[in-house]
Curated annotation (Swiss-Prot):
The lineage of its organism: Viruses, Riboviria, Pararnavirae, Artverviricota, Revtraviricetes. Residues 575-591 are annotated as: Immunosuppression. Residues 399-419 are annotated as: V4. InterPro entries: Gp120_core_sf (IPR036377), GP41-like (IPR000328), HIV1_Gp120 (IPR000777). GO terms for cellular component: host cell endosome membrane; host cell plasma membrane; membrane; viral envelope; virion membrane. The record marks 511-512 as: Cleavage. The surface protein gp120 (SU) attaches the virus to the host lymphoid cell by binding to the primary receptor CD4. This interaction induces a structural rearrangement creating a high affinity binding site for a chemokine coreceptor like CXCR4 and/or CCR5. This peculiar 2 stage receptor-interaction strategy allows gp120 to maintain the highly conserved coreceptor-binding site in a cryptic conformation, protected from neutralizing antibodies. Since CD4 also displays a binding site for the disulfide-isomerase P4HB/PDI, a P4HB/PDI-CD4-CXCR4-gp120 complex may form. Glycans are attached at residues 34, 67, 76, 119-120, 151, 166, 179, 192-193, 196, 206, 238, 241, 248, 272, 278, 289, 300, 310, 367, 371, 400, 410, 447, 463, 466, 611, 620, 636. GO terms for molecular function: structural molecule activity. This is Envelope glycoprotein gp160. A lipid is attached at residue 773 (S-palmitoyl cysteine). Some HIV-2 isolates have been described that can infect cells independently of CD4, using CXCR4 as primary receptor. These isolates may have an exposed coreceptor binding site. It comes from Human immunodeficiency virus type 2 subtype A (isolate ROD). Specific enzymatic cleavages in vivo yield mature proteins. Envelope glycoproteins are synthesized as an inactive precursor that is heavily N-glycosylated and processed likely by host cell furin in the Golgi to yield the mature SU and TM proteins. The cleavage site between SU and TM requires the minimal sequence [KR]-X-[KR]-R. Palmitoylation of the transmembrane protein and of Env polyprotein (prior to its proteolytic cleavage) is essential for their association with host cell membrane lipid rafts. Palmitoylation is therefore required for envelope trafficking to classical lipid rafts, but not for viral replication. Residues 20-679 are extracellular.
């Protein structure tokens, strides 16, 4: 019976062990998480200053479609934020500020410039008052005479002001007077009532540091793309309905680099963008009404700006080592005003913008496009907000867009806008900084393709909607790169399996994997976990090969640019991208090594799975979906794996220590003699302690028998208890009192009797506990025996029924076989008889013919 119980316990333990799931580490699974690592850029502009900012572009980039769902946000996006920051640095690099012009914070005596003759002013005022509306409000093109002569209606001369100021610097304690011509918008003047003189200062003189370029540089836009470092990837939402915010984009592609983009610095409009399509679509902020509207390229919208060139540039030596570039005009002559004109089907494009806005799911205003209008920002804003601000070959233009807004609303016919130039501008990225740009000689002209509109959508009571132009330059890059997101490849995954470490794994069919470089690793991201895990070995090799390939490509381009990387911001980013990839791979291998899984694609462990209710669906769930469910368990799993590995290393160390005793020569090793001496001392101490224990036990045993040790107290100090024993007392009492046949009076020391009493009580307690435990075990055994007998009888009965059923089925099959055999035999015999008769009949035909012939002849 005990053997049967032991077998049942072993079977239950085996079932428990078999049902326990253990943590299995997979290396090479297609999973990722959001990342903020710096990107590096690549460009094909090899002949401009931008080539020292980015690496050469080889155009060898591919995209792989993923069967996954991912969240995208153009405004909460590290790719767009890096683009905004980097373009700002490119902008700063292009003008290279180096000289602080703080000496110009001096009082200047200024007077406004006048025309050379009074005829210009008269003709100007006359033309303003006497021209017909047809002449004033005409739409111009390339062939319009006023466009070629820069004298279209409404365009005048740039407002300038002549100033004089004194500076000390070239000669000690000697002042020198300088004459300078400023744009009137770059100075602020105040009138002294006591002297009736006008004193002017440079604008923003006391609030910012103004810098001038050491050399004259143009802000030439460059086209470039961002690339992810090895070990990282870029995901793109390929859904045409994507509007800047999509929590569940189901059309996702993976790539190593973005599309080409162009550096843009302008307000109101975006120029030369790469996202223009044959449709109009809107990117809308997820929490407010900020939008960026991509215009339909079908309408061929463009902007042509021009500044007539009738000024020269001269150098003014302010003090030793400080040179100031001043724009010099002939006396009493002001420069012509800059202006821009709009080409293309602008009215049709703006009407399509209104219709697209009315259909947008985020829009809650009126659907009547007649009540949707374009509006300028409110008055009192910064010049970059109130005017359209753009850069034309180094000069910053501030264009008054009132005529343009009236033109697209069919209120006027002027498709051009007057502009003025400022030398001191507000920066578009960092608030409160001003950059001084030197003037330029000659005529300036620039042509740009208009691809987007920066605007805020405002509506009230479903009656009127305003599309207000905005000065958020950063929105341009959210349109360019807002459908991308940067992710870090996390090839280490955890999943529960029944295999334990050192157990044999089930055989798996080997599947081939097409090596597609680094992105080939992500090709199985949309596959089920089971299918992806079958190719995990090949995927890990593809991952490593892709990282090495990207490292080599990056190293090659860095080598080609090593001379130009000394003074650029991008150089450090490129080198950081290379170092980051190596660190990431080493970090993954370090984690695997801490778990005892170094350089293993599938690693079984002895750590039990922490949550039995959480199990993967190997046939229908992707690794990315599974990773999202177990991400909160990764810290605990990692800690448990590290502890298990530490314990494993300790066990291996102890095992190696035991293995050292297998060699007989190690017993006589000199390094072991100290241990031998230590063991001898411990043995001696143990023997002495054992002797002490034995002596104490013997002493207690003598005390129990009534003896006193030699060093005990004198008898007079021990109180004696007189115990009278009755001779008629039962024999069992005599036996209990150690015989009792001696009779008479006996004297017991009362401490010894008390000890005997305690010992008897302890014996009774232990006896009772023993009896209770024995009864409990016996009853449990009887209960288990009864259950076992009933289970055995039930199994025996079911086995008998099954055996009887099998015998009955066997007999039925045998009977069916006999019947079939007899039926087939009878059928064969009957068929044989029929065939035999037919054969005999055929054989008898000649005989019958002969007999008939004989009868006929007779």
């Amino acid at each position: 019976m005990m053997n049967q119980l032991l077998i049942a316990i072993l079977l239950a333990s085996a079932c428990l062990v078999y049902c326990t799931q253990y943590v299995t580490v997979f290396y090479g699974v297609p999973t990722w998480k959001n990342a903020t690592i710096p990107l590096f850029c690549a460009t094909r502009n090899r002949d401009t200053w931008g080539t020292i900012q980015c690496l050469p572009d080889n155009d060898d980039y591919q995209e792989i479609t993923l069967n996954v769902t991912e969240a995208f946000d153009a405004w909460n996006n590290t790719v767009t934020e890096q683009a905004i920051e980097d373009v700002w640095h490119l902008f700063e690099t292009s003008i290279k500020p180096c000289v602080k012009l703080t000496p110009l914070c001096v009082a200047m005596k200024c007077s406004s410039t006048e025309s050379s003759t009074g005829n210009n002013t008269t003709s100007k005022s006359t033309s303003t008052t006497t021209t017909t509306p047809t002449d004033q409000e005409q739409e111009i093109s390339e062939d319009t005479p006023c466009a070629r002569a820069d004298n279209c209606s409404g365009l005048g001369e740039e407002e300038t002001i002549n100033c004089q100021f004194n500076m000390t610097g070239l000669e000690r304690d000697k002042k020198k007077q300088y004459n300078e011509t400023w744009y009137s918008k770059d100075v602020v003047c105040e009138t002294n009532n006591s002297t009736n003189q006008t004193q002017c200062y440079m604008n923003h003189c006391n609030t910012s540091v103004i810098t001038e370029s050491c050399d004259k540089h143009y802000w030439d836009a460059i086209r470039f793309r961002y690339c992810a470092p090895p070990g990282y990837a870029l995901l793109r939402c390929n859904d045409t309905n994507y509007s800047g915010f999509a929590p569940n984009c189901s059309k996702v592609v993976a790539s190593t680099c973005t599309r080409m983009m162009e550096t843009q610095t302008s307000t109101w409009f975006g120029f030369n963008g790469t996202r223009a399509e044959n449709r109009t679509y809107i990117y809308w902020h997820g929490r407010d009404n900020r939008t960026i509207i991509s215009l339909n390229k079908y309408y061929n919208l463009s902007l042509h700006c021009k500044r007539p060139g009738n000024k020269t540039v001269k150098q003014i030596m302010l003090m030793s080592g400080h040179v100031f570039h001043s724009h010099y005009q002939p006396i009493n002559k002001r420069p012509r005003q800059a202006w821009c004109w709009f080409k293309g089907k602008w009215k049709d494009a703006m009407q399509e913008v209104k219709e697209t806005l009315a259909k947008h799911p985020r829009y809650r205003g009126t659907n009547d496009t007649r009540n949707i209008s374009f509006a300028a920002p409110g008055k009192g804003s910064d010049p970059e907000v109130a005017y359209m601000w753009t850069n034309c070959r180094g000069e910053f233009l501030y264009c008054n867009m009132t005529w343009f807004l009236n033109w697209i609303e069919n209120k006027t016919h002027r498709n051009y806008a007057p502009c003025h130039i400022k030398q001191i501008i507000n920066t578009w990225h960092k608030v409160g900084r001003n950059v001084y740009l030197p003037p330029r000689e000659g005529e300036l002209s620039c042509n740009s393709t208009v691809t987007s509109i920066i605007a805020n959508i405002d509506w009230q009571n479903n009656n009127q909607t305003n599309i207000t132009f905005s000065a958020e330059v950063a929105e341009l890059y959210r349109l360019e790169l807002g459908d991308y997101k940067l992710v870090e490849i996390t090839p280490i995954g955890f999943a529960p399996t029944k295999e334990k470490r050192y157990s044999s794994a089930h055989g798996r069919h080997t599947r081939g994997v097409f090596v597609l470089g680094f992105l080939g690793f992500l090709a199985t991201a949309g596959s089920a976990m089971g299918a992806a895990s079958l190719t995990v070995s090949a995927q890990s090799r593809t991952l490593l090969a892709g990282i090495v390939q990207q490292q080599q490509q990056l190293l090659d381009v860095v080598k080609r640019q090593q001379e130009l990387l000394r003074l650029t911001v991008w150089g450090t980013k490129n080198l950081q991208a290379r170092v980051t990839a190596i660190e990431k791979y080493l970090q993954d291998q370090a984690r695997l090594n801490s778990w005892g899984c170094a350089f293993r694609q599938v690693c079984h462990t002895t750590v039990p799975w922490v949550n039995d209710s959480l199990a993967p669906d190997w046939d229908n769930m992707t690794w990315q979906e599974w990773e999202k469910q177990v991400r909160y368990l990764e810290a605990n799993i990692s800690k448990s794996l590290e502890q298990a590995q530490i314990q494993q290393e300790k066990n291996m160390y102890e095992l190696q220590k035991l293995n050292s005793w297998d060699i007989f020569g190690n017993w006589f090793d000199l390094t072991s003699w100290v241990k031998y001496i230590q063991y001898g001392v411990l043995i001696i101490v143990a023997v002495i302690a054992l002797r002490i224990v034995i002596y104490v036990v013997q002493m207690l045993s003598r005390l129990r028998k009534g003896y006193r040790p030699v060093f005990s107290s004198p008898p007079g100090y021990i109180q004696q208890i007189h115990i009278h024993k009755d001779r008629g007392q039962p024999a069992n009492e005599e036996t209990e009192e150690d015989g009792g046949s001696n009779g008479g009076d006996r004297y017991w020391p009362w401490p010894i009797a008390y000890i005997h009493f305690l010992i008897r009580q302890l014996i009774r307690l232990l006896t009772r506990l023993y009896s209770i435990c024995r009864d409990l075990l016996s009853r449990s055994f009887l209960t288990l025996q009864l259950i076992y007998q009933n289970l055995r009888d039930w199994l025996r009965l079911r086995t008998a029924f099954l055996q009887y059923g099998c015998e009955w089925i066997q007999e039925a099959f045998q009977a069916a076989a006999r019947a079939t055999r007899e039926t087939l035999a009878g059928a064969c015999r009957g068929l044989w008889r029929v065939l035999e008769r037919i054969g005999r009949g055929i054989l008898a035909v000649p005989r019958r013919i002969r007999q008939g012939a004989e009868i006929a002849l007779l």
